[in-house]
């Protein structure tokens, strides 16, 4: 299809310009009466035509007929007004008006088309001017005369016995439309130049003609698959996020470092789900504004809100998962983060900073479902506010996970010596969870970069579709089909299941039952409805304090804990005086965190509290 359009352009340029560049001073030229059956007869206001030496009407008419009847010629132009003016200019350029009986010379001179005829083409064929590379109304012939004079051309004929300043009027037939309204082939939308220059979010494919909104670039089946996947998984993820926030934020007696990170993750996942919910709210396609052809941008409040939530949720989740992997790394190495509060404040400050900074640059695109940082004009905001911080944090996450895997591998001998494979299983489960979620966030952060640097694939699909519209019309052109839908679907899938992964990695564990059983608030609520489960039904103010340990709470649990028939006594680090006691502390603290995050620095925190 693209090749056909190129052939059309060759036809246009060749037949437009071939006759125009013939030498105007041709002593062998002659005048003839135009054959009335010529296809150009209705476009000329004269019958006396100019024939250069060596040409006959039959030769010229054969070329005219081939051009005007060829499906890849002028007939491919869908706009009738533009087509009429182009054919008129073509005819008066091919069959130029002949001027004979000029004083002092024996050969005729042609009249070139008046410049206003050329301007009519420029005015009425704006959407197609990009196809006429090099075409101008200020061209000259081989004698240096204007191809499209304003009123007349002047010739020095003294060498032939004529005047030194012979004027020849230009041809200006009355036929042809003077309507200068630009018409865009359906379904392209006409937009004024001022609107486009004002920075409105249009996708201009030809001068003043933009892509419609919405523009569907996948099949209905593909859109449905993506839609139902996102609806189900985002709803489930939002529910899980609320569950994690309630469990580790309200139900648990003492909030540990690890609990705070899980709460943070719950809020970032909720922000991601809120972004999806915002774009699904209301009627019509979220990408489109009320103005035809204009895609939403930050000047639309709901687009700004959606972009903010998406940036908060996406980048925030990456930051918090990196913080979680750092906490896991410290726990494996029996250390604690003494500056956890400052770290948390700093991370949240960065998240808000990178979400608010591009607040005026959120926009929707052809391929997007909602709004995010646009790269329509430049990519600075996308790189500075997402790619650079996301990739730096992801790289740190890889380092923490790799170091933790190595530590777990080294501790395998210890796990075997105490004959408790459950500990090894729990830690391997944590590592597996981190690796899977690392893959998801890496894929979702790399996919937009892949699209940016492979945009030609998508632009080519749009270009072929536009060429088809110009050649055949909308009814004969199939829907645009972007390739690599599998990657697009995988990106949506990985993003929507973050909450579900958090459930399997953090929210399903025997330790959760202990949290609910020992929770004073939860048991108090059960007591109000007549259910007795656990120990203390009345909440105390003391239980609401926060702990900087990564393990769970409860003085009873600190003294002794039973795990699948095996009881391990916990002792303070400062009370251990032998290697056996040290091993007992290490094994007990490892087993104390059934969610598979080792809890050895619990004892360090107790020691610090005693001091």
From Swiss-Prot:
Give the principal location in a single coarse category. Answer: membrane
Please state every residue range assigned to the domain named FZ.
Answer: 26-187
> Could you list which ranges are Extracellular topological domains?
25-230, 280-302, 360-380, 452-491
Compositional bias, Low complexity, is annotated for 538-554, 576-590
Q: Which GO terms describe its cellular component?
A: membrane
Q: Can you tell me which family this protein belongs to?
A: Belongs to the G-protein coupled receptor Fz/Smo family.
Which keywords does the record carry? Disulfide bond, Glycoprotein, Membrane, Receptor, Signal, Transmembrane, Transmembrane helix
- What is the recorded name of this protein? Frizzled and smoothened-like protein N
Which parts of the chain does the record assign to the membrane side Cytoplasmic?
252-258, 324-338, 402-430, 513-611
Q: Where are the transmembrane segments?
A: 231-251, 259-279, 303-323, 339-359, 381-401, 431-451, 492-512
Species the sequence originates in: Dictyostelium discoideum (Social amoeba)
Where found? Membrane
The annotated topology with respect to the bilayer is: Multi-pass membrane protein
- Disulfide links within the chain: 31-98, 40-91, 82-125, 114-184, 118-170
Please list the residues annotated as glycosylated.
63, 140, 156, 165, 179
Instruction: Give the start-end ranges of region Disordered.
Output: 538-611
Where are the compositionally biased (Polar residues) regions? 591-602
| Record has Transmembrane helix as a keyword | yes
Report the leader peptide range: 1-24
